[in-house]
């Protein structure tokens, strides 16, 4: 079974994303900020990380940079899912190692 870590400070977004991913047979874990997400990745590296940009404690971008620097052999796919919708954010995310970039709100 594929695994996904949802990293978002919004409980509502995490709940909706969890519901969608579980219907697609993903095993889902959640984190409310980047620091918590790093801890969860150290315990069990997911296949996919669904990542918000703006969060307290540690942003999604900080998390992504630290995750990629650690150079784990089993690096997850990282999909930013954020309200940041300008080209500068998109370019920065992709250059830092994000695999995809999806803008909220989404249908």
Residue positions per predicted region:
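Receiver (REC) domain active-site loop signature in two-component systems and cognate sites
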Residues: 55
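Active-site beta3 strand of CheY-like receiver
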Residues: 44-50
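Alpha4 helix (beta4-alpha4-beta5 surface) of REC/receiver domains from two-component response regulators
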Residues: 62, 85-100
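A Lys-centered signature of the CheY-like receiver
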Residues: 104
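Short hydrophobic/Thr-rich beta-strand motif most characteristic of the beta2 strand and flanking loop
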Residues: 25-32, 40
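Acidic catalytic/metal-coordinating carboxylates
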Residues: 33-36, 59-65
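Charged docking surfaces used in two-component/phosphorelay signaling
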Residues: 15-23
